[in-house]
Design a protein with these regions (language model features):
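Conserved glycine-rich cofactor-binding loop
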Residues: 9-12
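A glycine/serine/threonine-rich, flexible loop-to-helix segment
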Residues: 89-91, 171, 184-206, 246-247
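Catalytic Tyr-X3-Lys loop
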Residues: 92-120, 137, 158
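Active-site helix of classical SDR
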Residues: 123, 154
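Alpha-helical segment proximal to the catalytic Tyr-Lys
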Residues: 128, 167-168, 230
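Short, small/polar-rich loop/turn modules that mediate ligand/substrate recognition or access, typified
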Residues: 170, 175, 232-234
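A conserved structural motif in NAD(P)-dependent oxidoreductases
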Residues: 206-217
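Short C-terminal tail/terminal secondary-structure segment
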Residues: 233-247
Length: 247
């Protein structure tokens, strides 16, 4: 039976890969993103339904939810990324203790909005549409385990929130889990800041000696939404080739 799937941040990278995987199974897939042009191009190329929306803005999330229809089976909260890589200078450029605090506050709020609030808002907006047997899949990061940055903290908070969410929605027949990727090649996550030396270190840290691929994350999301994963909930699945282990 065809499912209805929503993938936030579906215009490129991992979101596009996840959307493509569900489409291959005959599902109806809605993709959202801030870049309306790129979203439309991706939708036309892969056969998805685009809804331009910034997942950090309540009014845009509410509008997006209204365009979905009444039913939903799978929610993949992919929207996010390390805003430290993409943001222009934020806050005042003045010197002094207050100016520094304002810059720190702006940087932290940006990553928390992009990586935590986006998932919370989207999930809240569509929760009543998710049918029994449905799945909520949030995408975290290995940075939640190692990065002493606002990005790592935001992804750690996402995992903690997901565990609590699982307890809340279990009685409705829903599951909620986190996929935590390690280094994934063929994406623009690092925005041109990944040096060859660091890339080599990231690959060397794995047990299987290779970078992750978008398909690794797409297949994991597809599995978590399958009938075979109905007793998996409240968990963080690490997809990193052994770069981080739970024991």
């Amino acid at each position: 039976m065809s499912r209805i799937v929503l993938v936030t941040g579906g215009g490129n990278g991992l979101g596009r890969a996840v959307a493509t995987r569900f489409l291959a199974d005959g599902d109806t897939v809605f993709i959202t993103g801030r870049n309306a042009g790129r979203l439309a191009d991706t939708a036309a190329e892969i056969g998805a339904k685009p809804i331009p929306a910034d997942a950090t803005h309540p009014e845009q999330v509410a509008r997006m939810a209204g365009e979905l229809g009444d039913d939903l089976d799978v929610l993949v909260n992919m929207a996010g990324g390390n805003t430290d890589f993409t943001a222009a200078a934020t806050g005042t450029q003045a010197d002094g203790p207050l100016a520094e605090l304002e810059r720190v506050a702006a940087a932290w709020r940006a990553n928390l909005d992009a990586n935590l609030l986006s998932a919370v808002l989207t999930t809240t907006a569509v929760l009543g549409r998710l049918r029994a047997g449905g799945s909520i899949i949030n995408v975290g990061s290995i940075g939640a385990e190692y990065a002493s940055t606002s990005y790592g903290a935001a992804k750690a908070a996402l995992a903690a929130w997901t565990a609590g969410l699982s307890a809340e929605v279990g009685a409705q027949g829903l599951t909620a889990n986190v996929i935590s990727p390690g280094y994934i090649a063929e994406t623009d996550f690092f925005r041109g800041r990944l040096t060859g030396e660091r890339k080599a270190r990231l690959i060397k840290a794995t047990h299987n000696g290779r970078a992750g691929q978008p398909g690794d994350i797409a297949e994991t999301a597809y599995f978590l939404a399958s009938d075979g994963a109905r007793h998996i909930t409240g968990q963080t699945l690490h997809v990193n080739g052994g770069a981080h282990t739970t024991r």
